[in-house]
Amino acid sequence: MRSDMNNTHPAIPRQAPANALNTSTIQPGAAPQQSMIRHIIAIDPDVDRSGVAFLHLPSRELHCEAKTFPELIDDLHATKQATDALGEPLIVIVEAGWLNRSNWHVQAGDSRRKAAAIGRAAGRNHEVGRKIVEMARHMGIETVEQRPLQKCWRGPDGKITAAELAQFTGYTRRTSQDMRDAALLAWVHAGLPIRI
């Protein structure tokens, strides 16, 4: 655990509101009711730096970061402690490309070597995602393995652009593609409107 880390995250309020909900009624493995969720952490797994989005639902405050695996696990632990102290529900959404039959981005003209490299990279990312899910569940955090969302945006390969994300979330800080994908995952899971 990093020594400079405190028990709160920028996307988590420091004091519990008067109407804070108690999570003691949520059964392990059962999906919590959408109205109860107050904090969503969405993760787009990557071998080097995963895209992570922290969404506080009551305020719609969104915070995006890129984290290495150890940093991410430390943040999950700290956020779990902070939300438990506030008595507020937390859920983690992990993009689970391994649930699709094929999530490779191979073009028709790619060589066998390139196709193998793409498959190897996808497999490594999938394993990171599985380990994130395993660690989050080990910490007692409600965790959802989410199939990748449909790619219907203006960016390369149908991925969401920074401008598109800013239009409906208001988040204008610099982001990587993994961070934007995580933010979109959190926003969609929360059922918040997407207007472009």
Enumerate the predicted regions with their spans:
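Phosphate- and other anionic-substrate recognition elements at nucleic-acid/protein interfaces
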Residues: 2-196
